[in-house]
Amino acid sequence: MFRFKFLKKPKFYVWAGFVLFLLVAAPIAIDFSFEELYLHTERFQNHRSARPATVAVVPGASVYKNEPSPVLKDRLDCALELYHQGKVRKILLSGDNGSIYYNEVKPMLLYILKNEVNERDIFVDHAGFRTLDTLVRAKEIFQVKDLIFVSQRVYQPRAAFLANKIGLKFQAFEADRRIYTSGPFSRIREFFARTLAWVDMNLFKTNPKYLGDPFPIEGSGIKTWKGSVL
């Protein structure tokens, strides 16, 4: 009969304990390092504290019955605040449109269009599946050099880390406008997402799912709407 003889060796338990320690300690260390980086990031909850930037980048979030969820609505409202107060000249809406059954960017675009934004100033990225995709594509496809990232506080440290890694000038607009029912779950999910982001950038050098030809943010964004309302 086959026996697991290695289980009787003390060295096995030493190595197993060491591996287990790394699996627990590494994500905690990464989480703290992201928070430390964020302490040195320009961040605010009001447009008055923002420095002018080229574009407000709004990552997608859940939509319900083709309407933005509270989390997403607050992000969009903050982006509109930045635009109408002259802090940004463009708005880039980046979300998941990878299925005919789910489309984040169409409700985002329709919401922005209802709020007196020049159509030429609105850009849509249909392949913003993750924050990594959103930021790398903003730089590589839309030729963005400086941005204000509009999202809730819990997600901002990861975005700041990614932006720092790829060389984007980054400001964080914390779009928390209420207490969200998803709050505790979001923090747990974000804990692991930060570890994945660290691994993506430092070990695997992960690229976005899709790249493509440049479409500079300085022009008109109307052609990027295809698949949303066109």
Regions found by a protein language model. Name each.
Residues 184-210:
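A transmembrane-helix-recognition feature enriched in membrane-embedded lipid enzymes
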